UniProtKB/Swiss-Prot annotation:
Belongs to the universal ribosomal protein uS2 family. The keyword rRNA processing does not apply. One of its GO terms (cellular component) is cytosolic small ribosomal subunit. SUPFAM superfamilies: Ribosomal protein S2. Keywords: Ribonucleoprotein, Ribosomal protein. This is Small ribosomal subunit protein uS2. GO terms for molecular function: structural constituent of ribosome. It comes from the Bacteria. GO terms for biological process: translation. PROSITE patterns: RIBOSOMAL_S2_1 (PS00962). Pfam families: Ribosomal_S2 (PF00318).
Amino acid sequence: MSLMKEMLSAGVHFGHKKAFWNPQMKEYIFGINHGVHIINLEKTVPLFQDAVNFVGKTVANGGKILFVGTKRQAQDIVEAEAKRCGMPFVSHRWLGGMLTNYKTVRQSIKRLAQLEKMREDGTLESLTKKEMLQNIRTIEKLEKVLGGIKEMGGLPDAIVVIDSNKEHIAIQEAQKLGIKVVAIVDTNSNPEGIDYIIPGNDDAVKSISFYMKKFADAVIDAQGLDRAVEAKADEAVQA
C-alpha cells in the first residue's frame, strides 16, 4: 500500500472545523468538506517522509529521540511505540523545565532510582508504615511523570510531538536549546518555528497510531543499521 493510501485509511487528511483554523496552515489545506478542513496529503507525504528520514538518520548517528504526546488519545500509543523502539517518552504531563531545567529534573530521576532500589532490596519495609507509604506514593508520582525519560541520560537530539498546540511548552523549550522539533500540525495549529512540519490529523487514534508506528519502525531500522556498522567495526578490529 502506498503511503498516501495508508494516510487516507488512517484519516490523516481530516483537519478541524473551518471555524477553528489557523490561516498559517492555508498552504497545506486542500479544501472543505461538511465544514471540516481537508489536509492536502500531496503536501503531507513528502514532509512526513523527510521527518521519518531525519529521525532515522539521527538515531543511526547515535542520537536520541524524545516522543511527546500527553493528550488522552495519544498517551498509550506514544508509550507503547516509544518502548518498542527503546526511546524516551513523555505521555502524561509535560513538566515545565523538563528540557530547559534538565539538571533539576535529573536530580528527581536520581531520587526515583534511589527509591526504586530501596523498594527492590527491601529497605522500604524497614521504615515506619507512614514513611513507607509516603515513599511509595513518591515513587508512583515520579514514575508517572518521569518514568519515560529516566533512562534518557541527557538531553535528546530531537523531539517528536503529536499535537503542536497541546505540547507548545515542550516545543518552546526545545527551540530555546536548539533541539530539532518534528511535529504533527493540524489545521488549527501554528507551524511557525517547527523544523519538520507534518500537516495532519492530531486527534484520531488511527492517525496517531500511524505516525508513531512509522517513527518507531524508522528508529528500529536505524538501530539495526547502527548495530551492523558496529559489528563490521568489531570484525575489523578482530581481524
